[in-house]
Amino acid sequence: MMQRRSPPKHRHDGTSPLPLGMDWSPPPRKWNGRDTVWPHDPRTGWSYCVTIPSWIVLPKSRNSDPVVFYRVQVSVQSPEGITTMRGVLRRFNDFLKLLTDLKRTFPRKGFPSAPPKGLLRMKSRAVLEERRCSLEEWITKLLSDIELARSVVVASFLELEAAARSACQDVDQNASDSNNDRSSTSSSPMVHPSLSLFHAGGSTLTSDYGSDTAYETSEVGSPSVGQDDISEIGTEDLTLDEDLTLTNPIEKLVNFSMSNIDEGLSMSETILEQLEDFPKHKVRSRYVNNILGKDVYNGNASKGVFLANNGSRLLSEPEPSTHSVMHDRNDSAERFALHTGQTSTSGLLISSRDSHLDLRQGPGVSLGTGLVCNPERQGSAQIVLPLELRNKLNRILLATNERLVNAKTDMEDLIARLNQEIAVKDYLNKKVNDLEGELETTKQRSKENLEQAIMSERERFNQMQWDMEELRQKSYEMEMKLKSREDGSSHAEPTVQSTISEKHVLSKELDARKQQLEDLSRRYEELEAKSKADMKVLVKEVKSLRRSHVELEKELTHSLTDKTNAEKLLQEERKLLENTVAARKKLLSDCRILHDRLKEYNLNLSMDGNGNFVDDSTTISDVLRLLSISDDQIEEAQLLSGFDENAAAEDIDKTLSMDTETRIMEDELRKILANIFVENAKLRKQVNSAMLRALQKDVKTTEDVNEENSDEKDEASRETLKR
C-alpha cells in the first residue's frame, strides 16, 4: 500500500498533477491579449488563472423563464509568456456543487463561505453584478490553496484539459511560424494515421458541471456537439459570446471531444491504444501538441506524448500492469521532466536530426546530440536537459532564490506590522473596556436615581389615593346623615331649619373637598409630566456627562503633562541659579587670589638722592634673584588668569538656559577683570625690567670705576719703578 503524499508547499515545484504541470496564479491586473504580463515569472512553468468577467441571461427552452449563466474565463500562460483564454458557462448552482464536492474530497479543510443564494426573481443588473463580483472573489480565495487548485474537482469544473489543448495549439502555431526556415532542411514529418482525426466511439460521457447535451448522437453515428458548457439549456436557443466561438473546425473538434476531463480521458486512451501498432524504434520529429496525456488519479492508466526544446519527442510505453504519470514542465520550452513509477520498459528518444537512440533501463544515458539524462531517483524519474541550457537554468535558480529572499523579508515586515497592529488593537480594546466599565457605572447610577425618583412619586401617588378615599368616605357619611335627618318627621321646625343650615354647610364642605380632589388630580398629572421631563433631562445629562467625562480625562492628562514639564523647568531653573551663584563665588575667589599674588610681586627697592637704587638686601645678586622670581610669579599669574577664563567659559556653556542679559553682563565682567589683571601684570613686568636694567647699569659703573682706579695705581707704581 502506497503512503499518502504530503500536501504541496510551493507552486511550480514539478509535482502538479494538472495537464502540462500547470499551477494556479493570481490574475493579471491589466489584460493585453497574448502579450499579457502576469504577476510572476512565466519561465517557471505553465500557469492558469480564473476570472468571471461577465454574465448572460439565456432561456432554458422556448417557453421557459430565462436562466443566468456566469462566464468563467480560464486563461493559460505558457513558459514563453503567451496567454490564451477559454470561456466556460456555469450556473450559480454549479458553484455550490463545486463547493460540496470539494468538501467531500477534502473533509478536513476549511473553505471560504460561498456567496448567499437568495432569490433572484427580479434579475436586476446591480444584483447580478454584485453576485458576479462575489463569485470571482470567492473562487480566487478558493484557488489560493495550492492543494485545492491542483484537485481533480477543480480541473473538471474549469475544464483545464481543454484549455491546455487550445493553449498548446496556439503555442505550436507560433512555433511552426517561427521555425519554417529551420524545418525546411529536415525531413518531411510523419504522423500516425490514428492521430489525424479524433473519432468518438461507444457511449458518450457528460460532465457533472457541463451541459447535458454536450455530446448528442447524430443520424450518421458521429457525435454532434451542442452548445459549450451550458447546463439544462436547449441547443436551439443559446448563443455564446463571439470570443467563445471557434472558427477552426479542428479546434472545434478537439474542444468538443475534450469538453471535460472524463471525455478527454476516454478519447486520449482510445488514441494511445491505437498507437500501440505504431513502430517504436523510429519516429520522425514533429510537434504533436494536440494530444496530451491525461492523468488518472485512481492509478488506472496514464500515457502521453512530451516534446523537448530541439524538436525531439519522447514516447513512453508502460507495461499493461504498471502505468506512468507524465507531466510536461517546460521552463521556457527548454526543460522537461519525466516521472515514472515502477516501469520496466525503456523509453525512446528521437532527435530532430533523424538520430535514433534507445534509452535502456540504466540510471542514465549520455546522448551525442547535446542532451544529458541525469537520474534523480533510481527507476522512478529521469531528467533530460540540454548541455547549453545549464547556465540559463542556474541563472533562473539564482533569480528564484533572490525572489524567495525578498519574499521572506517582505513577510517579516508584514509580521512586524501585524504585531504592531495587534498591540494597538489590544491597547484600544483595554481603553474600550475601561470606557465601557465607566459607562456601566454611570448607567447604574442614573438608573438608581431614576428608580428613587419613581419610588418617591409612587409614594406620593399612593398617599393621594388614600386621601381621596378618606374624602369619599366622609362625603358618604355626610350624605347618610342628611338622608337620616330628612327622613325624621318627628323633629320640630327649629331642627329642620338647623338641618337645612347644616346641609348647606356640608354641601359647601363637599364642594371644597371636590375642588381639593380636582386640584390633587391636576397636581398629580403635572407631577407625572414633570417626572417624564426629568427623566428625559436626566438621560441628556447622562449623555453630556459621558462626553464631558472623556473631555475632562483628556484635559487631566494634558494638565498632568504640563505639570510635569513645569516641574522639570523649575528644577532646571533652580540648578541654573545654583550654578550661577557658585560661578560668581568662584570668580570672586579667583580675583582675590590674583590680586594677592600681584601684591607679592612688589620689590623692596628704594632710590637715593641721585636717582640710584639702594638695595635693602645685602647684595645686588639678591636683588637680581628677587626680580627673576617676580617675573616667574607674574607669568604664573597670567596662566592662572587664562585658566580662570577657560573655566568661566565652561561654566557659561553649562548654563545655556540662563537669561541672555545676565550671561552677557557676567561675560563682560570677566573680560574686564581679566584685562585689568593682564595690564597690571604687563606694567609690573615693565617696572621690573626697568629696575633690572638700572641695577645692571650701576653694577657696570662701579666696575668701571674700580678698573680705572686699579689702572691709575698700576701707572703710579710703574712710574715709581721707573724713577
From Swiss-Prot:
Pfam families registered for this protein in UniProt: PX
UniProt GO cellular component terms: cytoplasm; cytosol; endosome membrane
One of the protein's GO biological processes: protein transport
Keyword Lipid metabolism: no
PROSITE patterns recorded: PX
Domain of life: Eukaryota
Coiled coil: 401-474, 503-555
Knockout mutant characteristics: No visible phenotype under normal growth conditions, but the double mutant plants erex and erel1 exhibit severe growth retardation at a juvenile stage.
Biased composition (Low complexity): 172-193
Gene3D superfamilies in alphabetical order: Phox-like domain
Basic residues composition-biased segments: 1-12
Annotated PX domain residues: 48-165
Start and end residues of each stretch annotated as Disordered: 1-26, 169-193, 209-230, 698-723
Composition bias type Polar residues, residue spans: 209-225
Localisation per UniProt entry: Cytoplasm, Cytosol; Endosome membrane
GO molecular function, a single term: phosphatidylinositol binding
Ranges of biased composition (kind: Acidic residues): 704-714
Alphabetical UniProt keywords: Coiled coil, Cytoplasm, Endosome, Lipid-binding, Membrane, Protein transport, Transport
Function according to Swiss-Prot or TrEMBL: Acts as an effector of RABF2A and RABF2B. Involved in vacuolar transport of storage proteins. Regulates membrane trafficking to protein storage vacuoles (PSVs). Binds specifically to phosphatidylinositol 3-monophosphate (PtdIns3P).
PANTHER family the record matches: PX DOMAIN-CONTAINING PROTEIN EREL1-RELATED
Protein name, as recorded: PX domain-containing protein EREL1
